[in-house]
Amino acid sequence: SSGSHVEYGHDFDMMGDTYTYSYDQSHFNSAHKNALNWMPWDQIQTVNGNYSGRIYAMDQTLVPGRRYALRVAVNTTLDGKSGLDYWVEHRSRFPTNAYLSDGALIYTSDQAPDKNCTDESLKLLDMNPSTPSVSDAGLKAGQSFTDRSNRWKIQVTDQGGSGANSWID
């Protein structure tokens, strides 16, 4: 279904709502961290087929050998912009928000090894669009997001740990 784009509408990103949350809570999203070389490709799992695995909270200090984001290479189109992939990330610095602490944020981006991530391409997907806020945009454990046109399904099956050891499967 269609929705609307809100400029600077990613409440949990540094370029979003920095007035409500403290600076230690807000982090750039994983695609932008990657574009800035703050999150290297070896900490991002890129998939274009079936995959089941774990990602850790990307708003903590990165530990070598862990994955902090999932890039689903689907080359989808949204709002007339093509060549977009889905990005999935988990955040732990919002412990009172179960949509983040127990789930995943999903967005589209054109970030790829040969591209720069631009504002026009980054879209946070609200998994609960019936509410007026994106504070519940996350996909909680047990929920799934399906892209029927690209035949993709993203599902959070479990969550565990806390702080720097917080993860989702």
Residue map of PLM features:
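Extracellular low-complexity, Gly/Ser/Thr-rich intrinsically disordered linkers
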Residues: 54-169
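Extracellular hydrolytic enzyme modules, especially secreted metalloproteases
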Residues: 1-97
